[in-house]
Amino acid sequence: MSAQQQCDLTSYDAMYYLQTGDLQLAVNLFISPNSSFSYSGNSGQSILQSLGTIIIWVYKVNGQIHIYTIGWQPIYYSLQNGCRANIYFRLWALIQIQGAWLASEIMNMPVTLKNTGGQFVGTFIPLHLLGFAIADFPSLSSGSQGYTHMLMSQTDGSIKLLPSAPGVLPYFITVGFQCRAGAYVLKQPCPNCIFVRLCVPTSNGIPYEVLMLICLLIYAGCYASYSDILGKNGLSTVGAGVNAKVPVTAIVYFDTQQYIQQNVVSQLNVTIQLYALIWVGISTTNFVILPEISQILKMPSGLILNIPVPFQAYPTPTVAIPRILTLITCCGTPYIYNQYFPCSFDKASTVTTECGVPLVAYPTISQMQPIAGSNVAFLLSNQSADFADLLSLNYGLLNLTTQQKVSLANQYSYTMTQCKKEVIRGTYYEECVKNVSSNLNQYSSQPASPQPNIPVDEILIGVGAVALIVIGTVALVLTGGASAPVSAGLDVAGAEALGSLLLDNGALSLSSLQEEGLANTLMQTSVSDSFESEDEEIVQNEPNSAKLVVFTNTNQPFTLTVTGTDITGTVTIQSGIADFDLTITLPSGVSVPISVPAGVIDDFTDDQGYTIYEQEDQPVRLKYSDGQVIYNTISQLGKKLDGFFSLLKKLLKYIAVALLSAIASILVNMFLFMPLVASIMTSIIQSGQGVSSGGTVTVTGQSTSTTLSTALSDIASTFGQIPQILEEIPVALASAYLITDLLTDFFGDLWRGFSKNLLPNKAVNVNIPQPLEVDLKSRLKAYSEAVISKNDKGEWVINKKLRGRFS
């Protein structure tokens, strides 16, 4: 047996090391004896740095800046023999909770790096692609006070995260592991699920957040023999090494989107769906996948966060099987490159997935073909094409030239280094990730959506504004009458939260927004939110509200002809009925017809006798009464909305999810509201024509007649104020997602603050012909807090305040 073969036969090495209740991992580096790799001095330190911490977030706590990290945290390394080095790492595990963010060292993940004759194969996790969250606790201390020493082995065999120092929030997780003879084995408390208990502190009030999503990747280490694993899975044990002990790696992906319970105030009990992604790492020539994965691999691609992602084969001559799994989850992108078997349970024959499929492996045979010519030393220093090969595979970038791969690796290393510098300067990590993605996407055969240089903040504000307008429209249809109390004012924070949600997850692209002219029509400003009285009537023509403009017709029929560069058509009124027939040309050149047939919808008649012309498939709202066409909304909208929120509060637990879905659906239908409004008003100003058929135009509050162009200028001047009052609007939808139990109170307050500045004087709603889809269950970059107190009526209420955003 050659020296090279001896170095490759390392299947007996453990990945996990149990030390004083703390799980640590060893990365086994397989180096050929003739490599130039050095284990001492600066070279060893360089390796630790190359696999070291990645800074992702800056968080201000009590006036102090804390830099939180996620990534491999190198502890120390040791030379085990002439061809193998063990480097010990810690990893910050990730748990994402809507409204509360926890990143704790609850589990350390093993990575196996193997050099088979010079070719790198193994398990590699690109950490910056993992879904990440940040802990909302005072600090991450070190030594005995740190989270490193909070992993305790319980008497029931489970692993819990327990606090060991005052001031650290008492989050702890029960993950369903069983300690058996020194080996941790995944167990199932119930046949088709895993139970996770999340106990949250109550010192600052009832935790109102409903747990919407946990993305948790767990790598569990245990020992088993070749023959035991192969035999239980119906495979031949011939040549398997008989009783050889091998490391086992279990990869489990949890998804709680459809399994949510909220129990007592101090505890959230969540039953988690267990996906059958369970593997055992064995260095043999067999590759085994589970039934569900077999079905996934048959698909050419899948939707990940609304983005088509191909399931591709592993393009290397070292593995000859048709497909090696490229597993992509919403938590990140773990790539499985090595040979694996499904994990051995205590009762493997009786364990099934959530679909009732037994966890029995289906074998596929492959053969390792060693290739000489490289070593892991260069790979770890990020200087050779080996690292570039790995990196390109991690990003799903295939068929790259050697030069492109090396350039890819250089771009990656450079941008990640810049991230650390920018965080120190105060720039957020998200910008760095965008830089990394931008540099890497240039090599992809299927590049991501282009990111043009346009004012993103303004776009996000506009998108959020439309969301609130839509919510009000839906509310108006559903209710009227009663009044709801005001429990909290608005707080300016996280204006881009909603837009970031849409853009980050591919629901909207900046290029599509730019095509419709949205980027050129919005401004970012701030407004006052001092409107607090629940009974105060909205005063017409007050500051910050649009003026009521009345077109008085003295002859029948009365026809308003509009001829401009962007909008053309007519508005005809006869016998008390108005017909609207307009065409709007967008900046992209697309023409949108707007034709509101004659007729009256009585459900939209206010107490002043005005009616609103509005149909679901028509994008313009107007109203007409007694010979007057009024380009406004009704003045009692706020009062009717109070009734809606009062009613909805009683029914919230039953309709919250449905309401959010409706908001998401309607939101995208309406997201081009602002550019079309701007186009309409600009065109009317530019093309102001006199009133035909002898009509005259008067403006309410003025004693003399004026021309149509002057009246339209008044409209446009007040309409121009709309973009200036939208900064707080996106906070509404972001908070609705985070605070389901308090949804109605928050939106009630938000609507009052909004209506103070805009209502009741006009509304123009525009639908786009083909609405996009939005996934509101994706992450939001905002968080919130609740404080419980008694009001003057002796009732317990929760005051809400959106505190900010992370990026």
UniProtKB/Swiss-Prot annotation:
It comes from the Viruses. The chain crosses the membrane at residues 210-230, 234-254, 270-290, 459-479, 657-677. It is a multi-pass membrane protein. Its main location: host cell. One of its GO terms (cellular component) is membrane. It is found in: Host membrane. Keywords: Host membrane, Membrane, Transmembrane, Transmembrane helix. This is Putative transmembrane protein ORF807.
